[in-house]
Amino acid sequence: MGLPWYRVHTVVLNDPGRLLSVHIMHTALVSGWAGSMALYELAVFDPSDPVLDPMWRQGMFVIPFMTRLGITNSWGGWSITGGTITNPGIWSYEGVAGAHIVFSGLCFLAAIWHWVYWDLEIFCDERTGKPSLDLPKIFGIHLFLSGVTCFGFGAFHVTGLYGPGIWVSDPYGLTGKVQSVNPAWGTEGFDPFVPGGIASHHIAAGTLGILAGLFHLSVRPPQRLYKGLRMGNIETVLSSSIAAVFFAAFVVAGTMWYGSATTPIELFGPTRYQWDQGYFQQEIYRRVGAGLAENLSLSEAWSKIPEKLAFYDYIGNNPAKGGLFRAGSMDNGDGIAVGWLGHPIFRDKEGHELFVRRMPTFFETFPVVLVDGDGIVRADVPFRRAESKYSVEQVGVTVEFYGGELNGVSYGDPATVKKYARRAQLGEIFELDRATLKSDGVFRSSPRGWFTFGHATFALLFFFGHIWHGARTLFRDVFAGIDPDLDAQVEFGTFQKLGDPTTRRQVV
């Protein structure tokens, strides 16, 4: 039958065997993509510098997801946290990728088998002899099995009872490692940044799923509810499944973009709000202040700042700086970070310490303005020299570096001072290698941005899909223009399959 492209899926209506087949094939494609993508990423990933060239700077997408679930070692002899290892075991990055590819192959074969052997006895209604599915019963089975999986993940994998645990870090993404997590059963479990909530919520949701599954297996739906919600129609299943998927996609888009314990910044990069709020800058200043309180010199206090913390406080790591259509990793944008030059402190000739006003997230260009501790403008890089009052030359601004590669170095010539003032707009100053990857100097987003954009977009599309298929199944008789209880001569439209020979006919 000549079906248009948008109606080809009607071939699996009233055909349970082949409906199962196409779903198994879909699983094969998803699993095969995941395994293949993992192998590709492992082929191009450089594990040599986990501090300045982490996975998220290199544009890795599936490696962070494996890592947060407890995979840290490679058969190549490296660990994601740095250093070398001798016995990575079977569940390395390559082991997980291989398992997905093997599983994909098995699903591929199973899909072919079920396509060929579609007319199985199990799909046949013994009362009518026609193919049919007991959808409420199948719903109960799926709910029970997903509940068992959910409970098992929370109770065993996350807690380390039988499994590796998950990636856990401090609030500033400095000490992350895979460790077991105890369930948080108090109110703290509702804090999205508390890892214990992951364990407790999976245990609770899994328990609920098991109980709900058993309920749906043992209790039949009332006839009026069954008919009212069209529980016998496979398109009802499609509609409600799409609802579950788009709801989950909206949720994870939020947890990724705003940050949570499930999306650690060491694996996915910092969030834009950490730049907007000066999150890392405040922690750096707090640590420097603590160092000065211990009678350290300014140079010594800044030298104790971890390079990893300083690197987070750089606008190039803000996922909102990447343009929507700028393909490639962050390293392809501003380059590969090589080292921290140190923290620049600017002073005018009167001795005021000056602070460069930082660039907001959604600006591509921003005026270079230097203010004192009270927020009063003391110097700038003017657009028009004729009207300048606060130019670096007039005010006599100098810059001195503390910590990093330029520790103790100072500059007084205006051209160099202005160069570092422009760079200080972007946060801490780093030396960036743009030659190796031929980086173009234009900021890119991190996998955090890609994931959010992709899931929010598809969630919206799937929302419309849910409405579409839900309306089709609820108002099928209305759309067909036929009363389902009417014995017409030929009930065009009541039957969903084009050319269905089972269409009821009545001799007049």
Swiss-Prot record:
Membrane-related topology note: Multi-pass membrane protein
Keyword Transmembrane tagged: yes
Pfam family membership, one: PSII
Swiss-Prot/TrEMBL keywords: Chlorophyll, Chloroplast, Chromophore, Membrane, Photosynthesis, Photosystem II, Plastid, Thylakoid, Transmembrane, Transmembrane helix
Entry's Gene Ontology molecular function annotations: chlorophyll binding; electron transporter, transferring electrons within the cyclic electron transport pathway of photosynthesis activity
Location in the cell: Plastid, Chloroplast thylakoid membrane
GO annotations of cellular component type: chloroplast thylakoid membrane; photosystem II
The keyword Hydrolase is annotated on this UniProt entry: no
Identification of the protein by name: Photosystem II CP47 reaction center protein
